[in-house]
Amino acid sequence: MTTTVAVVGATGRMGQLISQIVEASTEFELVASLDSKDELSDMLGADIAVDVTLPAVSQGVVEYAVAHGMNVLVGTSGWTGERITELERRITGKLAVGVVIIPNFSVGSVLATSFAQMAARFYDSIEIVEAHGASKIDSPSGTAVRTAELMSQARGARGPVQAPHTDQRARGQQVASIPVHSLRMQGVVAKQDVVFGGNGEVLTISHDTLAPSAYEAGILLALRATRTARGVVVGLDRLIDLDGSRERAAQAAAGDAPSGPVDDGGPSGQAATVTSA
């Protein structure tokens, strides 16, 4: 049985891409394409709504869909922690609906953010540089904001990043104590560098989106999750098996033991680590 989809913001770059993916899929059917001239009521009757509008419009779209019992996939930037918390208060445990908020549909970008989250515990000097096309209105990007927030959470007892000279405008906008620098220019799809400075070293975790096709796998994954979502789910990382725990659980349930390392008669991993250059 196919799931019917209404795309709000269908004439934008992401709206067009999602519409194409839905139309090419056998799992989903595009039944409504809305732009700024259409009434939100035109989305009613679809199984799920996809919001890819503008930050100033997105909240109203989501509230309307939720009020009419529709699950929503949000691909619009600008959903701050406060706005998400308010949405959670409104619907969690009260309405049988789900809202899936995805700051970035790229699996590679999600992995880069996960790596940055791991590294944040080991460095006290951290900054983010993100770049998007000149037409992107909001800054910092939703991906940069989420990356900064996740790194701040991961730091735990290390506390906030103590970035120097943040009173100067050229030092970027602080998000969860981490300076974020935004570039908006022609020729760029999406790029983010998370830069860590340590004693005598610099670590850069970089992700560069070269074409919109990078979002396709994440969009399909998010659409599938939106069908059955309840409450508020934020981030593609919540939908993919980052640590392999779901795969291991599935193997255990099926009675399939995961294969262990092959003993080739050589030195153990510990010995090899000690003796290798």
Curated annotation (Swiss-Prot):
Residues that coordinate or bind NAD(+): G9, A10, T11, G12, R13, M14, G75, T76, S77
PROSITE patterns: DAPB
Stored InterPro entries: DapB_C, DapB_N, DapB_N_CS, DHDPR_bac, NAD(P)-bd_dom_sf
Keywords for this protein: Amino-acid biosynthesis, Cytoplasm, Diaminopimelate biosynthesis, Lysine biosynthesis, NAD, NADP, Oxidoreductase
Binding annotation for (S)-2,3,4,5-tetrahydrodipicolinate: G142, T143
Residues annotated as the enzyme's active site: H132, K136
Binding site for NADP(+): K37
Biological or metabolic pathway of the protein: Amino-acid biosynthesis; L-lysine biosynthesis via DAP pathway; (S)-tetrahydrodipicolinate from L-aspartate: step 4/4
Source organism superkingdom: Bacteria
Reactions listed under catalytic activity: (S)-2,3,4,5-tetrahydrodipicolinate + NAD(+) + H2O = (2S,4S)-4-hydroxy-2,3,4,5-tetrahydrodipicolinate + NADH + H(+); (S)-2,3,4,5-tetrahydrodipicolinate + NADP(+) + H2O = (2S,4S)-4-hydroxy-2,3,4,5-tetrahydrodipicolinate + NADPH + H(+)
GO molecular function, one term: NAD binding
GO biological process, one term: lysine biosynthetic process via diaminopimelate
A Pfam match: DapB_C
GO cellular component: cytosol
PANTHER family, alphabetized: 4-HYDROXY-TETRAHYDRODIPICOLINATE REDUCTASE 1, CHLOROPLASTIC-RELATED (PTHR20836:SF0), DIHYDRODIPICOLINATE REDUCTASE (PTHR20836)
UniProt-recorded name of the protein: 4-hydroxy-tetrahydrodipicolinate reductase
Organism field: Clavibacter michiganensis subsp. michiganensis (strain NCPPB 382)
Taxonomic placement: Bacteria, Bacillati, Actinomycetota, Actinomycetes, Micrococcales
